[in-house]
């Protein structure tokens, strides 16, 4: 099986798992951590071009699990995290990873945040090494073993 086929299959499986837990994923910590994860993936290579930012924002709005939250609230949180990362990537990354870590107390939410990162990262057909690296860092911030997600 080609790498892209495995990524698509994995993302599809993860989306199904997220949908099964949709009603459990309504906390503010999950919301904040998810938007931080989306920003990290968007900025994985150290910058975010406007088209990439728009594409990730569109994916956020279309994700059924994230529809538990007001779209404007998600957009604002995503933009705030993106702005931190574009102002100073290294310093911003520390702050954004702290947002991700908010989901650490609830393992199901922590896993869901990682799954969202993988889904967003693989949505363009290429879950590249930079995206994998930031999702792996998020695993450490959430006290989850990266190998659980094939990272």
Language-model features: locations:
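Small-residue-enriched hydrophobic alpha-helices in membranes
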Residues: 1-40, 50-151
């Amino acid at each position: 099986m080609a790498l892209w086929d495995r990524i698509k299959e994995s993302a599809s499986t993860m989306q199904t798992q997220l949908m099964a837990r949709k009603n459990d994923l309504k906390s503010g910590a999950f919301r904040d951590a998810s938007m931080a994860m989306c920003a990290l993936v968007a900025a994985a290579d150290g910058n975010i071009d406007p088209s990439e930012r728009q594409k990730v924002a569109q994916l956020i709005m279309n994700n059924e699990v994230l529809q538990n939250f007001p779209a404007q609230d998600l957009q604002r949180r995503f933009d705030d995290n993106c702005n931190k990362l574009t102002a100073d990537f290294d310093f911003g990354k520390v702050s954004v990873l702290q947002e991700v870590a908010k989901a650490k107390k609830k393992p199901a939410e922590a896993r869901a945040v990682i799954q969202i990162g993988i889904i967003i990262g693989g949505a363009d057909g290429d879950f590249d090494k930079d995206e994998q690296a930031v999702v792996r860092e998020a695993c450490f911030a959430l006290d989850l073993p990266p190998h659980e997600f094939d990272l």
